[in-house]
Amino acid sequence: MPLNLYYAGLYEQCLSSIAVEKKRGTTHQLLHTEGLALRALNRISEAISSFLASQKLDPFDQSTTLELAKCFYLQGNYPSVIAQCDSIISTEGRAPWLAHQLRGLASFRMGDRHAAEKHLFLAYDLHPTLQAKQLIGELQAAAGKSQEAIATMNDIIALSPESINVLIELGLLYVKLNSLDDAFECFSRAVIAVQKQLACRSSMTLSTPQDSFIFSPAFFSLGYTIQAKDPRTALLKYRVAASLKGDSKDPHIWANLTYVFVSLSNLEAALVCATRAFQLNSTSEPCRRALGHVYICLGDYCRAFQILSPAMGDTRAYESQWLLGIAAAKLGELRIAMVCLSKAADGGLYAACLTGLLIFLQANDLTTAAQFSVKLKELDPDNDENLRQGKAAIKRLRKLVQEENSTVEGQAVSEKNEQLTTTDG
């Protein structure tokens, strides 16, 4: 029977069996099974054709409509997902929970968060699983409802303390809120959960690609939270993340390794990592930033400027704009430096604003320096050292402005005396 072959995971044999069966006649169930096997082989377009043909033979079979909606979702055809799900929801007094879940996910992808939230909550009410609740939490996070998302994720953790994905998602929410201690706890718990699962296996070899997708981010995220304070331990976490992933093609691991080696003053290793990240994804802003950062540390400002220059047109690449401003200033391009550092300062980067103040103090451009000093007072310092430098720079600016004013006043008095002397003569 084709269906038995499908459930056994023998998809090619299942399709061969269906081809034989079709010679004796095509049925709704046969086409449905064909669609399942084709989708399992990632032949999505062919699967859609089979499900549509099955649907024509029996338009009232909900299971075929749901499978068709799944295919459209995998294809990214979200309007069709909504159409299929709505056809079930509108004709059923109590529609299957999966119809609401798919409807909610498709609505979210199309930017209709109100409809997404409505249908995901309906799905959860009909079928209250941890996965459904996690989807609600992710939706809340994407909608900017961080506190609601954190509460939802914590509810899941209370019921399932070792849910690796949820712990990672919760940790990332805390990172966005700059609650790094809470993030560290979440990522640490995720790593412990991973280690427990690995300990249950006969070796460190992972059984499925999905395992590495889940396990690797736990170590990566933990490394991220500690790399500023403990780069050596962070390096170990990144190495584990890379080994669990099974390949070396994750550009973001390489980019983060760059900063670890910079912290360890190993610029040669940092350059290797940054170059690798850039080669893997040259359009990624974090990868460009990592390579530009290393070139600045090496004093190669021309290359840094070249790598970082796309940040000029990016409205949110504040850290890259900060670095680009430094490179521009070192190359004598003070106008470009002012534009870049101003953008970064407007983005809330205290360090970028401080850099602008220091650069234009050194250039004796007190007017521009004063503009950065005004902005600096509005921002929260990112660390005690930058706060100390900021106060010292503002104090120096005041002194220079006073000296300049005194000089101007002295010149004015001197000119007035000369005029009086000329008149007396």
UniProtKB/Swiss-Prot annotation:
GO terms for cellular component: 9+2 motile cilium; ciliary basal body; ciliary pocket collar. This is BBSome complex member BBS4 homolog. Belongs to the BBS4 family. The keyword Repeat applies. PANTHER family: BARDET-BIEDL SYNDROME 4 PROTEIN, PTHR44186. Residues 405-425 are annotated as: Disordered. GO terms for biological process: cilium assembly; protein localization to cilium. The keyword Repeat applies. TPR repeats lie at residues 28-61, 63-95, 130-163, 164-197, 251-284, 285-318, 320-351, 353-383. The lineage of its organism: Eukaryota, Metamonada, Diplomonadida, Hexamitidae, Giardiinae. Keywords: Cell projection, Cilium, Flagellum, Repeat, TPR repeat. It is found in: Cell projection, Cilium, Flagellum. Gene3D superfamilies: Tetratricopeptide repeat domain. It holds the Pfam family TPR_16. It comes from the Eukaryota.
